[in-house]
Amino acid sequence: MNKYVVILAAGKGTRMKSQLYKVLHKVCGKTMVEHVVNAAKGTNPDKIITVVGNGADSVKDVLAGQSDFAFQEQQLGTGDAVLAASDLLENLDGSTLVATGDTPLFTAETFNNLFKKHEESGNSATVLTAKAPNPFGYGRIIRDEDGNVLRIVEQKDGTPEELAVDEINTGVFCFDNKELFKALKQVGNDNAQGEYYLTDVLEIMRKAGHKVGAYEMPDFSESLGVNDRIALAQATKIMQRRINEEHMKNGVSFIDPDTAYIDSDVKIGNDTVIEGNVVIKGNTEIGSDCYITNSSRIVDSKIGNHVTITSSTLQEAQMDDNTDIGPNSHLRPKAVIRKGAHIGNFVEIKKAEIGENSKVGHLTYVGDATLGKDINIGCGTIFSNYDGVKKFHTNVGDHSFIGAGATIIAPVNIADHSFVAADSTITKDVARYDMAIARGRQTNKPDYWHKLPLSKDKEWE
């Protein structure tokens, strides 16, 4: 049987009070509509169609290559939105699942179970339902004695007996595709909103003698729709718990999982420990047996095995096996730390490679440089790479020693086994085995204390 998924993503989302199109707000690193598309992909459908309206180009950019698109010119209700996909679907055999782009918590497992229930039951329409702890505000599912769905009753229209029902409509449906589009053409807009409701299709199908059923999913929280910032925060919290629990099942330890903020695409190896107040975002990959301490932030970075990150920030950076950094250091884009290297506290590295077993201990800036292996960079060293117009590169060879307080003014090449004396300002190349000293000689003034006007001040004696 052919399977199709239609995702409704044309609403304005005015309650978000945002310039950003509603379904493009992110939950754990992905836009809401991407989460829904990913769940849809998990059903292996023959076609995914996203119905767009407001912000159509932005949604198309995000979902390029993942979905076909239909355009809803005016937002005239959910029924009208699905009908916008008729040119792509109307005459096809199979089953169509309809979901909304502002429900990021649905899983592929739930969508697969809905397809399965729909097919096995021989329904023309199957409603995805859930038992709500507090069903107020939701449409209630009213069934007959055989469990078939008679109707969906909205809060404002229900009798006391109907409103006592705790099974609610999640807004996701599965239909026989051809019957869906036949019924949609019969849906009217004689209601207070003047809109065409997808739920009216159920009554049309039932009156035509078609079977309408339901699949009750076990986890009500999946059905959370995001219409404002409060719901966005709730969805993020639920998604974050789901992500962290999955990592824990795979052997990752969280000291405080409630304060570890991990995006959905992050990969973490087993035996890694993550403390509280840690943020890991984007396409970051972290190896096994690492330790990430509190207040660390890692974005789009690749971390090897046996790495320790102490209260530091990494962005588009790479740390190979058996390296460490921090506290309070910053790896900026294109920083590469090779195996066994040590980056200490208050170090900033940008677009630079630190070779194997090299040490950059503290209070140092390294930018636009390539450092070899077994190098020691002294405290307070600055790689001066910018002349106000262009950036320039510095090379430091293997087994070199850079003394404390040095300033390396690019472009220069410091050869293998060479030395730079403390507090030197280096503007020329340094040859192999040489030591560069570029500072004024020390001069001592004998008995200078007694020549100062303040020398007789008792506080100075």
From Swiss-Prot:
Any one Gene Ontology molecular-function term assigned to this protein's record: glucosamine-1-phosphate N-acetyltransferase activity
GO biological processes: cell morphogenesis; cell wall organization; lipid A biosynthetic process; peptidoglycan biosynthetic process; regulation of cell shape; UDP-N-acetylglucosamine biosynthetic process
UniProt-annotated binding residues for acetyl-CoA: 385-386, 422, 439
Cysteines joined through disulfide linkages: none
Region (N-acetyltransferase): 251-461
This enzyme's EC code(s): 2.7.7.23, 2.3.1.157
Record-annotated membrane-spanning stretches: none
Region feature Linker, mapped onto this chain: 230-250
Cofactor binding remark: Binds 1 Mg(2+) ion per subunit.
Catalytic activity: alpha-D-glucosamine 1-phosphate + acetyl-CoA = N-acetyl-alpha-D-glucosamine 1-phosphate + CoA + H(+); N-acetyl-alpha-D-glucosamine 1-phosphate + UTP + H(+) = UDP-N-acetyl-alpha-D-glucosamine + diphosphate
Pathway assignment: Nucleotide-sugar biosynthesis; UDP-N-acetyl-alpha-D-glucosamine biosynthesis; N-acetyl-alpha-D-glucosamine 1-phosphate from alpha-D-glucosamine 6-phosphate (route II): step 2/2; Nucleotide-sugar biosynthesis; UDP-N-acetyl-alpha-D-glucosamine biosynthesis; UDP-N-acetyl-alpha-D-glucosamine from N-acetyl-alpha-D-glucosamine 1-phosphate: step 1/1; Bacterial outer membrane biogenesis; LPS lipid A biosynthesis
Record text on subunit structure and interactions: Homotrimer.
Protein name: Bifunctional protein GlmU
Originating organism: Lactobacillus gasseri (strain ATCC 33323 / DSM 20243 / BCRC 14619 / CIP 102991 / JCM 1131 / KCTC 3163 / NCIMB 11718 / NCTC 13722 / AM63)
